Amino acid sequence: MDILRFITAGSVDDGKSTLIGRLLYDSGSILADQLEALHSSNRKNDDGTIDLAILTDGLKAEREQGITIDVAYKYFQTEKRKFIIADAPGHIQYTRNMVTGASNSELAIILIDARNGVSEQTIRHSFLVSLLALPHVVVCINKMDMVDYSESVFNEIKAAYLQIAEKLNLKEVTFIPVSALKGDNIVNESQAMPWYEGQSLLHYLETVAVVPEHPFEHGRMPVQWVIRPQTDALHDYRGYAGRMVSGSLKVNDDVVVQPSGFQTSISRIEFAEQTLEKADKGMSVTLHLKDDVDVSRGDMLVAISNQPLRSKNIVADFCWMDSRPLDTSVMYLLQHHSKQIRCKVQEICYKVNISNLEEHAATDFKLNDIGRVVIKTSDPVTFDQYEQNPSNGGAILIDPRTNLTVAALLFRQAVDL
């Protein structure tokens, strides 16, 4: 059974928590103790029905404040598919949380309040979806019950959003009119909107293709651990453990060790105490090489037929995630897979004004700012362009003074400075 990872995003009070709660409740994905807590809760909607948003409450402190201040994950499954939901906060100051939640998602659900239409947060969330190249977008126009299930309201919002989607080059966009409070078109098709002839949200989620139309097929395995037991029984054992981030590698395949450039071939593949002929994307394996070449943690084993980019100067889209602004005089740590490299922001190309999607010159980056920069590293980085291979096209920036993650980077190209 395959897994669909998706994120929900919307402005404050657009009904994300209620939508997720309705999805879990109506699909029968609630455990007995959760159901009991739900029915015994004093939290009710204005019409006296159960407040399904309770099902997505996170930490106690978050519940007491009445907001969700981190990315909350929920898991459920139907007969057709397993699902992992990332619930991102709607507040503008939590844009970084949306980046975190969307980075591992394959689909985004963007909620729009039917009474308010497209908001600045709608544009911001859609821009992030475009930036992270999520292949599918579902626009749920929520609270249709509050506008008398009006087809004209739905069509007006749809037309307004399509203009944004065209600017952002969002190609796979589906629109569903819903009422999370009443349950219309969440799991079951709505009887109140006979003019809508599409699928319910759950039916769409169960049937949408999760395999990329043109997957990146070239093998990449960052080395996380060099295994040398140093025992009498395993004196000559030398394996390289890591997770396949793209493509596949087979026994006897020729590979290159990056960044050193040494060439060798694979002699054996181990997986969970078994010997395999092939390692595919997502598998954590141990590779053995035919030649005794120098391989260290942080190096990458790549298929010889297709080499990644390798550079000390990288153009990257950039989301600043720290309360302290960017300091271009500081040497930050670039974390790319298991490798840390010293680096600095060499140039700020531009920042994006989210309200109108225009690029403008800038001299600094503050919390939740998004734009493009040039990174200069102390050692070469082995990477692919994010749009071609997201699994090998992103990194984070760490401030060595605080050990905090301060930025997310999406690699776009190598440059000569």
Write out the residue ranges for each language-model feature.
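Helix-rich terminal scaffold detector
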Residues: D2-Y25, S41-K44, L111-I112, V138, ...
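Conserved Switch II/interswitch segment of TRAFAC-class P-loop GTPases
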Residues: R81-F83, A88-Y94, A102-S126, S130-N155
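P-loop NTPase switch module centered on the Walker A-proximal segment
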Residues: M1-Q93, S105
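Residue-level signature of catalytic and energy-coupling elements of molecular machines
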Residues: D13, L19, L38, G66, ...
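Conserved nucleotide-binding/hydrolysis micro-motifs of P-loop NTPases
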Residues: D14, Y25-D26, H91-I92, R115-S119, ...
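C-terminal effector modules of nucleic-acid-centric enzymes and ribosome-associated factors
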Residues: R5-T8, M146-Y149, V153, Q163, ...
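Conserved catalytic-core segments of large NTP-driven translation/proteostasis enzymes
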Residues: N155, L162-R324
